[in-house]
Structure formats: structure tokens, C-alpha cells
Design a protein with these regions (language model features):
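N-terminal cationic and glycine-rich segments that engage phosphates or anionic surfaces
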Residues: 1-99, 103-431
Length: 431
């Protein structure tokens, strides 16, 4: 491993890309520490310690939301905008045709930026009122209050756009996927909170609950097993054999070779979890924004509290949405009829199935089986940490979404680095 890094460091272009990526990540973490003007960050600490949806969003922003800093919104506006644009691409024919054009992806990326700015503005306004309701603002009335509101909201929006720009710079000049690496950095920065959870278990064990001495190593083993499980399932794929008929082009014989069609078990990645989280967290987030008083409005308080991410109703709805959106995203990404037609045009076929409808039907059946297994995998990884946290009373920061993102980004970045080195005849991680 260390030899591989030394070999990578000897390649000037790769060295520059690694340094550039590291520099962007350092700047991102510095931005997470720059406070927004006119806000008292200490007044917000208690609100984010209650385990509600804002606490979850704070984890995804690397703690910047609780400290009310420049990058408080994190990459959430960009992710939500990307989801909206993807759904509109399926629903609106003009956008669907645009996605198929040569330069269509660049135009869609520009639409993503504008949509991300709108989402960031909406979230900034909502978070401003949360800060105001918590009494964390230095100026709330008069011209000073208006000026403070404009500055705070503009700072949040500018920070969100700057994060989007930083992610795109990593895509162009660095290694790996920029936005994914920024999320990775945010999640990893919160791992220090695991130390607090561990010391809490040891304290309870020393106070007369010796079962926690057994629980701690069990949790460590389960975490390691979960990481291995996610790595294996993320890389798992079903390979369908493809045979190409021989044909003569000029004086050369073409084809006659066997290949395969790879169908990954987790084809949709973490997107179903992110989208399901966005939908099921809306009531809880609104409740956090409104700061409803339990004594004055007990019914509304109970309703919004029901959608707290540690409640059992949240777990059930979350699980069902993950299953549904996993099928939805696979249906968007894969068209069995189009795959079958492409195979026919290239003189390819699946052994035992005639070209055309029989081939597309077989691919459809295979996709349905794989999608079911992948959906169960995603649901288990996302929901089990929440259930475990409810049963043990621990605040498990490394949830299913975090685990999938961390493992997925690590694997993708490793592949990118290995591919870069393989092109220069260097032995990489996977070789």
C-alpha cells in the first residue's frame, strides 16, 4: 500500500491532482469553521443535541450547521436539486432529449446549478427563522435586523454555491468525484463523536451495568462486519453472457467473441436512501424550523415529533420509501428493450434466448430479481443502525447512509487512482 502511494507520488500529474484535491478539502473544512456574522453559535448547541432531523443534517454538513458557519448548508441543496432535475428529466420530454444530446449534460449541469441556488435560498430562509426563534441573532428588528437577515441568508447561499464550485473543480483537476468527496469529508469529521458514545458505554458499565462491557466489543464487531458486507455487496454484480456472431468486414473476420453484460447488485447506489431521507424528513425538519411548543400545540407537536428519525414510524416509512425508490431509479437507468435492440444491431445474443422480446423479457426478469436483493440490502444497511440505536440508547452517527457513502466514495476514488496509474503502466491498488 505504501509502495503504491510512493509510486503514485512519482507521477507529476497524479501528484498535482492529489495535492489539489487535498487543498480543496482543507479549504472546505476551513469554510466549515468560518462563522456567519450576527449569529451566536453557542445558543444553537442545545438544539442540535436533541437527536432531531436538524441533528442529522448537521452530521451531513460536518458540524457546520450547528456552528452556523459559511458552509452550514453543505452539499444538501445541490443533492436535492440534482434529484429534482433527474425526476424532471424523466417527466419532461424536452429535458429527456437534452440529456441524449452531445452537449446536453453540460446544459443539465447548468440547470442543476440554478436549481441548487433556488433550493439553497429556500433552506437559508428557513434556517434563518430557526436561528431567530432560538434567540441566537444579535439584531432582529429595525434596519439592523433587516440588514442582518440579508447578510446571513446571502452568506448561506454563497457558501452553498461555493461548495458546488469546489466539487466541480475536483472533478476537473483532482481525483474522484468532487461532491462525493466533500460529503465523505463531512461524515468523517463527525467520527470523533464516536469517542463520546464509547466513553458513555464504559461509564454506564462502571456505574453498575456490566452488560455494557460485553455490548461494546459486540458493537465493534458488528461495525466491522457491516463494512465488509457493504464492500462485498457494492462490488457484487450479475454477469449475463453475450455471444457475438462472426461476420466478415472487407478481408477481416469480426465478432465471434463472448462478452458479458454486467448488472450490479446495487445499481442505484445511495440515491434511493438520499431521496427517501429527503422525503421522510420533511415533516420533522418543518417541525424543527417552526419550534412548536408542546404545551401550546400538543397535537402538532406530537405529529412532527412522530417523524423524528429515531421513531419507529419513521423507520417503517423510511424502509418502504427506500424499496420503492430503488425500483424507480433502476427503471430510469436501465431499459431492457433498448438493451435488447442494441444487442441485435451488434449481432449479439444471450445464449438460450432469441433476439428481441425474449431477450428483453429475460433481462427484465433478471433486473427484477437483482433489484429486489439490492433494495433489501439498502433498506437493511439504512434502517438497522437506527433500530440498533433505539434499542441501545446510543446516538449512532455512522448510520447506513453514512456507511454507504464512505465505502462507496473510498472504492470509487481507489478505482480512479488505480485507473490513472494503470494507464502509465504502474501497479495500482487493484492490480
Amino acid at each position: 500500500m505504501f509502495q503504491t502511494f510512493r509510486n503514485a507520488w512519482k507521477i507529476p500529474e497524479l501528484k498535482n491532482r492529489l495535492l489539489f484535491t487535498l487543498a480543496i478539502l482543507v479549504v472546505y473544512r476551513l469554510g466549515c469553521a468560518i462563522p456567519v456574522p450576527f449569529v451566536s453559535g453557542s445558543a444553537l448547541t442545545q438544539m442540535f443535541a436533541n437527536g432531531d432531523m436538524l441533528s442529522y443534517l448537521n452530521m451531513m454538513s460536518g458540524g457546520a450547521l450547528a456552528r452556523c458557519t459559511l458552509f452550514a448548508l453543505g452539499v444538501t441543496p445541490y443533492i436535492n436539486a440534482s434529484i429534482i432535475v433527474q425526476l424532471l428529466t424523466v417527466a419532461i420530454p424536452a429535458l429527456e432529449n437534452l440529456a441524449k444530446e452531445a452537449d446536453g449534460q453540460q446544459k443539465l449541469q447548468q440547470i442543476n446549478r440554478y436549481a441548487g441556488a433556488v433550493v439553497a435560498l429556500i433552506m437559508s430562509i428557513g434556517y434563518y427563522f430557526v436561528i431567530r426563534n432560538m434567540g441566537a441573532l444579535k439584531y432582529v428588528s429595525g434596519a439592523a435586523g433587516v440588514f442582518a437577515a440579508v447578510v446571513i441568508i446571502a452568506t448561506f447561499v454563497a457558501g452553498a454555491q461555493l461548495i458546488t464550485w469546489a466539487g466541480e473543480q475536483i472533478d476537473d483537476k483532482g481525483i474522484g468525484n468532487g461532491i462525493s468527496l466533500l460529503i465523505f469529508a463531512s461524515i468523517v469529521s463527525n467520527w470523533s463523536s464516536l469517542y463520546t458514545s464509547v466513553t458513555g458505554l464504559l461509564t454506564r458499565a462502571a456505574a453498575g451495568e456490566p452488560q455494557f462491557y460485553i455490548l461494546l466489543p459486540v458493537l465493534v464487531i458488528l461495525a466491522l462486519v457491516a463494512v465488509v458486507f457493504v464492500v462485498v455487496m457494492t462490488n457484487a454484480e450479475r454477469r449475463i453472457t453475450i455471444q457475438y456472431a462472426k461476420r466478415v468486414v472487407g478481408r477481416k473476420q469480426m465478432g465471434g467473441q463472448n462478452s458479458y453484460l454486467p448488472l450490479k447488485l446495487n445499481m442505484s447506489g445511495v440515491m434511493p436512501i438520499i431521496f427517501a431521507s429527503a422525503l421522510v424528513s420533511i415533516p420533522g425538519t418543518i417541525g424543527s424550523f417552526l419550534q412548536i411548543d408542546q404545551q401550546a400545540h400538543p397535537v402538532w407537536y406530537a405529529f412532527f415529533h412522530t417523524f423524528n428519525y429515531t421513531s419507529w414510524l419513521y423507520v417503517v416509512i423510511y424502509l418502504l420509501l427506500i424499496l420503492a425508490f430503488n425500483y424507480f431509479y433502476v427503471a430510469i437507468q436501465y431499459n431492457p428493450v433498448e438493451i435488447a435492440n442494441n444487442l441485435r444491431r451488434n449481432n449479439g445474443s444471450i445464449p438460450g434466448f432469441r433476439p428481441g422480446k425474449p431477450t428483453s423479457d429475460f433481462i427484465t426478469r433478471t433486473l427484477n430479481k437483482i433489484t429486489l436483493i439490492g433494495a433489501i440490502f439498502l433498506a437493511a444497511v439504512a434502517v438497522l443502525p437506527i433500530i440498533l440505536g433505539n434499542l441501545t440508547g446510543m446516538s449512532i452517527q455512522l448510520g447506513g447512509t453514512s456507511l454507504l457513502i464512505v465505502v462507496g466514495v473510498a472504492l470509487d476514488t481507489t478505482r480512479s487512482l488505480d485507473s490513472f496509474m494503470t494507464m502509465r503502466n504502474h501497479k495500482g491498488f487493484l492490480g
